[in-house]
């Protein structure tokens, strides 16, 4: 590119920024949008590009006119822009003159052009400010500035007049460049002489398919605009602005992956040789993404470095027919363990500190900061784009060839009818799905073994499907299944559980039991334990046998394990109500309201203890088919001896001392000495008469005594009666 163009770079950059301020304000935007439609550029980015191009009047440099000439013309254009609006036709004529002028400029930028270009650019930057406002005016009144520009007597300016199309100041700037470009031949010649930016122009022109014609319909000749956009890319002054436009184009239909390396030497090797290799499972994911997306960008980071090392585009799927580079590998990994060689096009080899990315959180990795992720972690596209925009521009890398590849890929995808579908990776976290070697966590594959064996599928809507017990139990109506918690997604949610269902973070206690009967019982106990002290006394809750399970719909029968007939409960005597006994009971005194202890305060009892208290009030010999849990092993509460002792205590009526012994322990320890509980329960119960043989109520008294405290406090069941 001519030296003048380089000199102009600074002022042009300023102008480009000014133009950017006004981006997308005018009607031209719509025109641009139409032009760019085929282009696959974002209208906004295109407009910005064209603006950028305009701002660097040197866009002509794109058209291979020396940037100086174009900048001169551009500056004169800007100055004369309002008049320059003349008519698109003059622009066309000027195009031919432009092309010749451009060629001339290319051949021999006169010192005047060089210096003048510089000066003009500066003035342009000054004028541009006004131009931006003027531009809008121009858009409205496309006065024939072209004539004025022509008076400037520079053919490049004449080209600019073709910009008459420019409606907005920035757009007019762009269109100036475009006007210069408008003659496609000019563009081509420009592209030959001009930097790779011209390549961009070609792309756009090709995309436009004779953008000139198309451009003309737009208030500015869109094609010129595109050209100018491309030209803007060429002109260094526009370059800073154009870089973002190019990135925006590159981020279309793109997937982003985090690549973590244990060794900075490997990343340096990759930057030098433009290849990478990763583990086979990541290899497969990247290859799949390469088939489905227009671009696959890899964002590199070295572990413990505190920064990103740059980002690159996959140029091809991994190949095993290429020899591996001499990577620096830990002794535990053989080079043969790696996948194929992935060819890369580096877009930025510069580093970016993690501190600059703290505001970005990857929603595809449970909302963790984007810097956190394992090797091969996919980044949500919007966040990936934001992250890549934070990298400084790498001036040593020419983006145009990469953009051409991207455009070609897009064309192939269009022909094949492939549409990029953005969906989070199957394994939302490393604990997720057993697949892909990504550590199927606690609940990977065993579907039939019982609680928490759900195979996790993350394709559906919210991240947890309604909890459905695998034994045909309709347990909690709509929800309650929780993923194992991550600190970033703490409340898996007992959202759909019955009112007041357990809201604790751990897996619900009823999920721990293998049989549905045990699970149902545990569910009830959990419900009681959690709601104790938070609800007014509830109506009588019969023993588990008659209890309709919440959400079961059909009552108890609906919740029974598949093999158990509902009739098995008919053999049990109806529960004894305390008011069936002699005399009217005194009003129970309710426990003072208490703050529920923090979740996890009272860990669920062991399976044996749970079974023991559960069966305490049932007949000594359970009906056929009823699950037998603890036998008399746990203190004999459900054995004949335990029941006899309890009944004797209740009937004797005098065991006040015993009454305190069990309850006095309070807290979780209270129910652990089950013998004391059973014995003492009768002592407390004498007031009510021998209502359920002592055992029945001891069954209920256990879970609540743990919260209760002193022996004087009645059990939950006593309170409610």
From Swiss-Prot:
Q: Where does RNA bind?
A: 260-262, 276, 327
Q: Name one GO molecular function term.
A: N6-methyladenosine-containing RNA reader activity
Q: Which CDD domains match?
A: YTH
Specify residue ranges for compositional bias: Basic and acidic residues.
Answer: 135-151, 699-708
Domain YTH residues, every copy = 254-391
Summarize the record's disruption phenotype note.
Answer: Mutant flies survive until adulthood but exhibit flight defects and poor locomotion. Flies display sexual transformations dues to Sxl splicing defects.
UniProt lists compositionally biased (Acidic residues) regions at: 29-38
**UniProt keyword list:** Differentiation, mRNA processing, mRNA splicing, Nucleus, Sexual differentiation
**Region (Disordered) location:** 29-239, 424-471, 580-605, 651-721
Recorded hits in PANTHER family, A to Z, give:
YTH DOMAIN-CONTAINING PROTEIN 1, YTH YT521-B HOMOLOGY DOMAIN-CONTAINING
Protein name from the UniProt record: YTH domain-containing protein 1
Q: What is the lineage of its organism?
A: Eukaryota, Metazoa, Ecdysozoa, Arthropoda, Hexapoda
* Gene assigned in the entry: Ythdc1
